[in-house]
Amino acid sequence: MWLGTYFGGLNYYHPIRNRFKNIERIPFRNSLSDNVVSCIVEDRQKNLWIGTNDGGLNLYTPDTQQFVHYALQENQREDGFGSNNIKSVYVDEPRGLVYIGAHAGGLSILHRNSGRIENFNQRNSRLINENVYAILPDGENNFLLGTLSALVHFNPEKRSFTTVTQESDGTPMNLQKITTLFRDSQKRLWIGGEEGISVFKQHGTSIQKAAILPESTVTKAFTNYIYEAANGLIWVGTREGFYCFNEKEKRIKRYTTANGLPNNVVYGILEDSYGRLWMSTNRGISCFNPETEKFRNFTEADGLQSNQFNTSSCYRTSDGEMYFGGINGLTTFRPELLQDNPY
């Protein structure tokens, strides 16, 4: 849209580009510590905790647009982060703690009041693998950790790690290269990663596979993200498109570029207030209407940080704002403002 002004010349306004806002690293200014964003979480104060690939952890206050950086410094490995490549974050509000999983850095705990950081690795604990890609509370004040070699149970009070080696019936647990953990509304545990997806029932420290998934390629597909919509449908983002699991109908349906998806690598999935699904891919962001099964796709030309996004790097805040992390920072927007363009 071109706008003529009295003394200001001719201005160009793009109704779509101006709906997207990007947050990026700006050298020598208070900004994002690194442009490659790997995880995003909101706390009760509506601050965002943003993990990056090489810049550690960022605490971002949207109202003031100010950042606080937490990163590994030289000669600090004994009492700081084990790595600046952050893969997962969980905020424990009642205890004022932030749990941080890293690639090649183990598990760290940030004490928000004091700023003290504890780090657990293979040298000082029984953590079997220092690549912690997912952190999930188990409902009993303990945590499950998804690592690249096993599922690990962590007891914060005892500061103890237990590798889950078998199911409760004795069946060996051979899950490796776990990249995402999810708990559905029925309290079942979903584990996804390079080797596919599995569903378990959990009771304390014991878990047992739940045979709810019908035979499908999704069980073997490299899983990036698992999401439950408000209507109870489970959506799974993979490197081979995304899948919808309808448990009532015992049916799985797959969507790919043949259906209108811009790219088959789906990194993250979020639902808006209209029931539409927003997905980050390797070719921009796609909005999918489950009722009509129609796609609306957005690219870097529409104002995104890049066409490429990152695994599990997405979050919908309590205010309805959506954030997707990519290779050039964050793209944020309110989906309700992105109405269909009639032209």
Q: For the regions a protein language model found, what residue spans apply to each?
A:
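Carboxylate-rich, polar loop motifs that coordinate divalent cations or form catalytic acidic clusters
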Residues: 1-343
